[in-house]
Amino acid sequence: MMQYLPEIYLLLLGFTVFMYAVLDGYDLGVGILLPRNDVAQRDRMIASIGPFWDANETWLVLAVGILLIAFPTAHSLIFTELYLPTALMLIALIMRGVAFDFRAKAKADHKDHWDLCFKIGSLLAVLTQGYMIGRYVVGFESAPEAYAFAVLSALCVAAAYVYIGGAWLVLKTEGELQVRAARWSRKAGWLAALGVLSVSLVNPWVNSAVAERWFSFPEVILLAPIPIIVFATILVVDRYLKRVPTVNDAGVQWPFFGVVLIFGLSFLGLAYSFFPEIVPGIMTAQQAASSPETLMVVGIGVVIVMPTILLYTFFVYRIFKGKATDLSYL
C-alpha cells in the first residue's frame, strides 16, 4: 500500500483539478458571456453563479495544497516555469472577486464598470489557465511549436468554459436569456469540438510518447470509444440546445450534464496520456513524492477535507437548485 501512495495522490490531484475545471469552469464561462448592453440579463447571470462560485474555487486551493505537500519537487518546478501566467491568473481571480462584491453595492452608473472588470477577469483567468495547461502538457519545452500549442490550448479552454457556462445558463435561467445562452453554448460547443480535435492531433505530434500510447495496437482499438463518445455527446448536446426553449423546461439539464461528460472523458484521455508522470517527460509521481511518512500524515487531512468539500458542494447545489433569482447583499 505504501509504495502506491504517490500514484494514489496523483489520482486525487487529477480528480480535484477535474472538479475545479467543471465547477469553476462554468462560472468563468458565465463571466465571459456577460452582455454589454443588458443590465437585467447581467444581473440574472451573476445571480445564477452567486451561491456557488466561492465554493467552486475551493477545489483550486485543494489542488495546489495537494501538489505542494504531496509533490513538493513538482510544485517547485511547475510554478517556477509558470510564474508569470500564475501571477496573471491570481490577478484575474482577484479582479473577479472584487468586482463581484462591489457591483452589488455600486450605484447604477458604476455597475457597468464592475461588470466589465468581472468579464475581463474571467477571460484573463481562462486564457492563463489554458496556456498553463498547454505548457504543462509539453513538459515546458521552449521550442516555438510548444508555445504555439500553449496558445492553442488557451483558446480551446476558453471555448470549453464558454460552452459549459452557456449550458449552465440554459439550466438556471428562462425566457430570452435562456434562448441566448443556448445560442452562445452551441457556437462555443463547435469551437470546443474543433479545439479538442486540434489538440488531439497536435499533442501526439509534439509528444512521441503520447503518440505511442494512443496509436499502438491494440490500444488504438480499446481507446477509440473515447473520442467517438465525445463527439457523439457534442452532437446530442447541440440537438438539445437547438430545441430551447422547451415546454416546461423539459430536458434543459441534459446539455450541462453532457458537457460535464465531455470534460470527464477529455480528462480521462489526458490522464491516460501521461500517468504516472506528474510532469510530462520530466518526472513521475514516485520521483516527485514526499516521504511515505509525510504522505500518510497528509492522507489523514485529505480523508477529512475532501469528503467535507464534496458534502458541502452537494448541500449548496441541493439548496439552490432551480432557476436563478435576484442576488443581493443588502
Residue ranges and their predicted role:
Residues 98-104, 235, 272-285:
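Transmembrane alpha-helical segments of integral membrane proteins
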Residues 257-269:
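Hydrophobic alpha-helical membrane-insertion segments
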Residues 50-123, 136-141, 214-221:
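Membrane-interface helix-loop-helix modules in multi-pass inner-membrane proteins
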Residues 1-6, 33-37, 41-50, 104, ...:
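Extramembrane terminal tails and long inter-domain/linker segments of multi-pass membrane proteins
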Residues 279-298:
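Short, membrane-exposed interhelical loops at transmembrane-helix boundaries
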Residues 9-20, 77-91, 145-160, 219-227, ...:
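Alpha-helical transmembrane segments
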Residues 1-55, 61-64:
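N-terminal signal-anchor module of multipass membrane proteins
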Residues 102-248, 255, 269:
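Long, contiguous internal "core" modules enriched in hydrophobic/ aromatic residues
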